[in-house]
A protein has these predicted regions:
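Conserved ABC ATPase "signature" region
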Residues: 38-39, 86-105
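ABC ATPase nucleotide-binding domains
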Residues: 213-239
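Conserved catalytic motifs of ABC-family nucleotide-binding domains
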Residues: 130
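Catalytic Walker B motif of ABC-type/P-loop ATPase nucleotide-binding domains
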Residues: 134-137
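Conserved ABC ATPase signature
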Residues: 109-113, 117
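Helix-to-loop junction immediately C-terminal to a conserved catalytic motif
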Residues: 23
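ABC ATPase NBD coupling module
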Residues: 40-56, 86, 200-203
Length: 239
């Protein structure tokens, strides 16, 4: 059964680091990183390259090649990783674009796309090679409510249709509760809470409640750690 796990918490908590560990860009100080039964840190370069070929990535804000058309952006990984003839690549690109509702935008440049359209093109590129795993780094950042809903629905539908696993890093708990099977809350590199959407909604954990409710007060402090404000104000006076 495919699933759509979610890693969610405040900026700087280690969410994107998790994606880098999965992709083999970083090695863990301790523990294991297993993808498809393989220990990622122990893979030789050729094996790591082959694993990455089976993984898709949707970067924050899409990260499309600005000097390439929509069509060329999606064709890029196919040309890079396969020896498919151009006529097959053409058909596959149009198929991926059709899946995200943008077949008619194939010849547009990234500068001609709205934020939501750009994210959908990036999603089509992420599934270009029919991966077993797709990683999403803040896929909802900067999107209007309609585009956000469309992208969230696409992630869920493609996850189910392709039978893949999706790892979604996001701050948007509300949207993610509608699309994932399991949520993981990360703080300072540690999973502090987890559960299904139903379990998260019913949770009384103060940390989970603060994040789900968007409350300003709770375990996640408003102030960054600092010396006493009084001591800082009168440090020179006392000296």
């Amino acid at each position: 059964m495919s699933s759509a796990p979610l890693s969610s918490h405040a900026s700087g908590s280690g969410k994107t680091t998790i994606l880098r560990l999965i992709g083999g860009q970083l090695k863990p100080a301790s523990g294991e990183v297993l993808v498809g039964g393989q220990s990622v840190p122990d893979l030789e370069p050729d094996a790591l390259y082959a694993l990455r070929r089976r993984c898709g990535m949707l970067f924050q804000f899409g990260a499309l090649f600005t000097d390439m058309s929509v069509f060329e952006n999606i064709a890029f990984p196919m040309r890079e990783h396969t020896e498919l003839p151009e006529e097959i690549i053409r058909d596959l690109v149009l198929m991926k674009l059709h899946a995200v509702g943008l077949r008619g935008a194939a010849q547009l440049m990234p500068s001609e796309l709205s934020g939501g359209m750009g994210r959908r093109v990036a999603l089509a590129r992420a599934i270009a090679l029919d991966p077993m795993l797709v990683m999403y780094d803040e896929p909802f950042a900067g999107l209007d409510p309609i585009s956000l809903g469309i992208v969230g629905q696409l992630i869920r539908r493609l996850n189910d249709a392709l039978g893949i696993t999706s790892v979604v890093v996001t701050h948007d708990v509300y949207e993610s509760l509608k699309m994932v099977d399991q949520l993981y809350f990360v703080s300072e590199g540690t999973i502090v809470a987890s559960g299904t959407p139903e379990e998260v909604r019913a949770s009384t954990d103060p940390y989970v409640r603060q994040f789900v409710d968007g409350a300003p007060d709770g375990p996640v402090a408003f102030h960054y750690p600092a010396p006493s404000y009084h001591d800082s104000l009168f440090a020179d006076v006392d000296a």
